[in-house]
Amino acid sequence: MLRRALEEAIAQALKEMGVPARLKVARAPKDKPGDYGVPLFALAKELRKPPQAIAQELKDRLPLPEFVEEAIPVGGYLNFRLRTEALLREALRPKAPFPRRPGVVLVEHTSVNPNKELHVGHLRNIALGDAIARILAYAGREVLVLNYIDDTGRQAAETLFALRHYGLTWDGKEKYDHFAGRAYVRLHQDPEYERLQPAIEEVLHALERGELREEVNRILLAQMATMHALNARYDLLVWESDIVRAGLLQKALALLEQSPHVFRPREGKYAGALVMDASPVIPGLEDPFFVLLRSNGTATYYAKDIAFQFWKMGILEGLRFRPYENPYYPGLRTSAPEGEAYTPKAEETINVIDVRQSHPQALVRAALALAGYPALAEKAHHLAYETVLLEGRQMSGRKGLAVSVDEVLEEATRRARAIVEEKNPDHPDKEEAARMVALGAIRFSMVKTEPKKQIDFRYQEALSFEGDTGPYVQYAHARAHSILRKAGEWGAPDLSQATPYERALALDLLDFEEAVLEAAEEKTPHVLAQYLLDLAASWNAYYNARENGQPATPVLTAPEGLRELRLSLVQSLQRTLATGLDLLGIPAPEVM
């Protein structure tokens, strides 16, 4: 990467100036000279010089890498203009994943209660989690994707109770998770709901004993059909009943009790409970005490989350895994009493959970620190995200007001089919094209926005072939692929024939790896999504460029040498868009 090589050269020159600093090189503004630039304002205080003087001194001291044509002081910046041929060679270099580095990153996402169909709110969780896992893997990390199955939770118990209580029989036509979800909603609308609590508790206790697992699994398999349709990937399923059976909770509490900040008060409102004082790690709390174990001996969900986190990071062991029989994911493994012992010992974890769970996630990190693992606490990340509206409406599964992911997929595909029919009535496979466009529209809309901002999914906007949408990027890819298909084979490009149009497009292509690394470091895919939108816009501007009323950048009819250069750039662009879309879990259609 040219940027990284330039950063190394700058760091060496600054070291010789007595400043051991590593500055980030970024794209120079389009109205300023140069391609890249580095700001020097942060060094003014240490060097006791104005930034303009530092820029000039750095220029004088810096041996320019061979790919840099000149260094240009611009105010408090030092900008760099790259040699055109070096820029083009780098842009045409085939893209490849970054070298593998040691250490496992464990990404937990989806983790939907196994009691009903997935709804729109789950879409964002799956799209974010799956995309960040793909991005991290491309960036050189060993990634494990985990889906947590809360089979001992109240929601699962209520659904299984409702199916029996109302004597419901599945007819095989409706998806089973939808069938189960209707029973769950019926129970919550039942005027006898409160009277039924003791019977629901009996089902809950049966689940805690590891019973009724096959009934839960039946719902889970139906949910997994939806996850597979969304193109999500998983490596491990972890069932809460297996965590209970392995005694991870007791082991975690025993470990925490060794800390002076975890204790059992003898009096007051917490008398008899096991309490954690989080104030040494989270200052400023109005009430810093959090119950891990109630006075009646039952665990809070804080305690369960902490125990699970301890297992993820290798502090505790005890879970076993075996292959999971399912028609969607051949290599998937599930926790099970009869499996083989396995602990991921993750160096870093990312829990994709909505922003309303920020406080419990902070307590998980606090528990790691108080248990004597402050370094691991720093590596336990919460990818928090805001809620999703559908056409301006808020969802509520318990009230039966949620729209299922299956319905969204079906409706988006129906609308996409009509668009494909209108734009390309001779398309060889309209159904597959519609599926790909619908998936691109849905998944892109879930990741293009910064996670902590609420989004409102609207079909017409998301499916548009124009604007900041997945289909817009997919269409840019298909247009590039069409040119390559018509071109057939071509020879070596003549880099010396490049015009400013090729130079500008090549410079944008160089930003791909930087976008991937930034998305991986910031742990949010919206950075990559925005890059793909910008690259698609650059490609469309290149494709449609005109001078004196004539096309300025014809590809197939360009002179020899320039034609090969333009085809090579189009190929690099097509591959970059395809790779970027894949990292977001989105297919790249060849024809639209």
UniProtKB/Swiss-Prot annotation:
Give the superkingdom in one word.
Answer: Bacteria
Supply the Gene3D superfamilies for this chain: Arginyl tRNA synthetase N-terminal domain (3.30.1360.70), HUPs (3.40.50.620), Isoleucyl-tRNA Synthetase, Domain 1 (1.10.730.10)
Q: In the UniProt record, does the keyword Cell membrane occur? A: no
The record's GO CC annotations read: cytoplasm
Do the record's keywords include Glycosyltransferase? no
Q: Which keywords fit this entry according to its UniProt record?
A: Aminoacyl-tRNA synthetase, ATP-binding, Cytoplasm, Ligase, Nucleotide-binding, Protein biosynthesis
CDD domains the UniProt entry points to: Anticodon_Ia_Arg
Q: What Enzyme Commission number(s) apply to this enzyme?
A: 6.1.1.19
Instruction: List, alphabetically, the SMART domains matched.
Output: Arg_tRNA_synt_N, DALR_1
Short motif ('HIGH' region): ranges: 112-122
Q: Which Pfam families match?
A: Arg_tRNA_synt_N, DALR_1, tRNA-synt_1d
Q: Return the InterPro entries for the record.
A: aa-tRNA-synth_I_CS, Arg-tRNA-ligase, Arg-tRNA-synth_N, Arg-tRNA-synth_N_sf, ArgRS_core, DALR_anticod-bd, Rossmann-like_a/b/a_fold, tRNAsynth_Ia_anticodon-bd
Family stated for the protein in its record: Belongs to the class-I aminoacyl-tRNA synthetase family.
Q: How does it assemble?
A: Monomer.
State what protein this is by name. Arginine--tRNA ligase
- The gene from which this protein is expressed is argS
